[in-house]
Regions:
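Conserved beta-strand scaffold positions in the cores of enzyme catalytic domains, especially
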Residues: 38-40, 115, 145
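Cysteine-nucleophile active-site neighborhood
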Residues: 62-140
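N-terminal beta1-alpha1 cap of cysteine-dependent amidohydrolase-like domains
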Residues: 1-84
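Fold-independent oxyanion-binding glycine-rich loops
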Residues: 8-10, 41-43, 58-60, 92-95, ...
């Protein structure tokens, strides 16, 4: 088995060292004898989601995220089809808010891709940056547990 990981726009979305997430995945796959390669996409590149097994979408500053959001809207239908067909997306930091319906910044509300029915709001007095806990009525399992199970499956069962 050989996996292909697509890293979307690491030149713009690498605020908290998301290249480290790629390095960690690659090392864990190597330990398990799974061959993998990474393709980094810049904002002007065409993305063929059919070639990707995992997509990483990192976080960036508001300016960079708005640039990326506009680009992702151009390829939204292909990205959404990838997700709906069972494609794996690891959205970190601000990357996950781009997938939702909208998110708020100091400049106002930014329309997202609406691939996932979520939205994020900025804190009243300051930006909320830290680990999060989510609640969902979709399952008795917490979202955090679901994410851990998905990643566990990816890295241990292949």
């Amino acid at each position: 088995m050989k996996l292909t990981i697509g890293h979307l726009y690491p030149d713009l979305l690498n605020l908290y060292g998301d290249r480290g997430n790629i390095q960690c995945m690659m090392k864990r796959l190597q330990w398990r004898g799974i061959e993998a390669k990474t393709i980094e996409f810049e904002i002007q590149d065409e993305v063929d989601f059919s070639e990707l097994d995992i997509v990483l979408l990192g976080g960036g500053s508001d300016r960079e995220q708005m640039l990326v959001c506009e680009r992702l809207k151009e390829i939204r239908d292909d990205f959404k089809a990838y997700v709906e067909d069972g494609g794996v997306v690891l959205a970190v930091c601000g990357g996950y808010q781009l997938l939702g319906t909208h998110y708020s910044t100091d400049q106002g509300v930014i329309e997202g891709l609406s691939i996932v029915d979520i939205y994020t709001e900025q804190g009243k007095d300051y930006r909320l940056i830290d680990n999060i806990v989510l609640e969902s009525e979709l399952s008795d399992m917490s979202v955090r547990s679901a994410v851990v199970r998905v990643l566990w499956s990816l890295l241990w069962l292949w």
